[in-house]
Amino acid sequence: MCENVALDGLATTTDTSGVHHLSDKGTADNPLRVGLIGLGSMGRHHARVIRATEGMELVAVADPGGDRFGVAGELPVLPDVHALIDAGLDTAMVAVPTVYHEDVALALAEAGVHTMVEKPIAHDAAAGRRVAAAFAERGLVGAVGYVERCNPALRALRERLDAGELGEVYQVLTRRQGPFPARISDVGVVKDLATHDIDLTAWVAGARYTSVAAQVTHRSGRQTEDMMVATGLLEGGIIVGHQVNWLTPFKERVTIVTGEKGSFVADTLTGDLTFHANGTVASTWDQVAAFRGVSEGDVIRYAIPKREPLALEQESFRDAVRGVSQRHVTMAEGVATLDVVEAVLTSASENRTVEL
């Protein structure tokens, strides 16, 4: 499940008291009326998935820039969030540029619409807190679209860590790199990409960040950063490392979790999970054994059922609105991730370690 994780001092959806669920809707016979604002690179995929998800009906779309991907179909392309609200919605999906997240989300909260906002929740943590508070005060489900939590490799990894198959977790490393995306213009690589790794690391490890230290660079001619390297520490002494950029001529999405029994390697491009076990047979070549520190053991590649992560994300949001289950990424979690993102940017600009 692309589920939330209970962290000390960080609210999750485990306690749903005060939330006004739509328990009589979200079925094939009585679907949720869904509005989508933002018909760009992500919005077009959300439109496709919403239409294919049982219990959801796409009834309205909006984008002031029009419908360049032709996803509206027979629906009129509305000019703004207020026209979208006037269509009569149960839920909404926000896929506009990050700079507009706060204004659009607050309008939807004011109208009483359960909403999922694409990551990050807002352009900064203060705005994110305002958004999260608006939904909480009105008893609405507010979710953030961290779709990597629904990746089959990371879901399987989380389940195996929870089962204790790795023993004590020592380290989480992520690599997320590829060519420059033409779709991004309002944020840098930290808020666009590294935010995924920050969220999934805390989720997989079940622990909060306590400190980060980072470096960024600007090589593509834009004001925002396009390359980042960061290290950090989680509660319990788990060390983390993130390598993220838009300057690599190939795509890579890898998460490596190392612990007392070996290492898990999750490839989120392919959805594959591999386990490299610590060996139990001692090496007779003393120099090699001393160099490796641990011996090489069995390598296991798991057979994992694979469904589209975006479909699982929409189903989780639908079920949260219905009150059936609580597996979505909460807005409180989205704010916590943005706190770490801002700490990364502060660390890079001030050349110091930032405590959280």
Residue ranges and their predicted role:
Residues V117-E118, G142-V144, A266:
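Hydrophobic residues in well-ordered beta-strands that form the structural core
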